[in-house]
Amino acid sequence: MIEINNVSRTFKEKKQEIHAVQNVSFTIPTGEVVGLLGENGAGKTTLLRMIATILEPTKGEIIIDGKNTSQQTMEIKRKIGVLFGSETGLYDRLTAKENLQYFAKLYGLSKHESNVRIENLAKRFGMKEYLDRKVGGVSKGMRQKVAIARTLIHNPDVILLDEPTTGLDITSANMFRELIHHLRKEGKTIVFSSHIMEEVEQLCQTIVMIHKGNLIYHGSLQELYQQEETENLNYIFMSRIVRGETA
């Protein structure tokens, strides 16, 4: 379970304070798939980075499986797999296999465990023939597949994805959606941000809407549709902004 308790994050820029996330609270049960919606600059990435322990909250706390992320960072990091859009975390001069071996070692996997995981992930994503190619020389879609494999190499319980289908072709994007379905069946907790409303509707049990750092909705899609008496998610999102609603 992930508990977000009254979390805020402020940045200082040219003597001004930027309130990226403001007093956000919600809970994500274990094994749930959550879609994070909001316009550019809404605070989605900042919130994901705080859950991932990359950033610390200015105020409030984040609890993952009963452990405070600010106090047990390394233990929490081993539970989490992270992919932030085009920030693949890969090394261009290394092959796909060398990249995956490197990250497997960082997470404490044995050589045998690493090889088994790499073989399984390569088969899963159809990239076996690319394992010995340098990452800098493969297509964007294949690079994203390697990045997703890197995210899953240590078999994390919590998976955080920021705009994961951005720049992917239709085949690769559909592969990602299938992956989410499989990970959900495995009991993984998944939080991903997206601008594609249909993608969120197809994959998520729960959605979180953020506008200018404020939480404007957290709950199931069905509850939201019943409240708004429409299933047009774009319309609902804009209507809540216009009405100035907060959760």
Predicted region positions:
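Conserved catalytic motifs of ABC-family nucleotide-binding domains
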Residues: 155
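Conserved ABC transporter NBD signature motif
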Residues: 60-70, 76
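Catalytic Walker B motif of ABC-type/P-loop ATPase nucleotide-binding domains
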Residues: 159-163
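A short, flexible loop at the N-terminus of ABC-type nucleotide-binding domains that lies
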Residues: 1-4, 10-23, 73
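Conserved ABC ATPase "signature" region
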Residues: 101, 105, 112-130
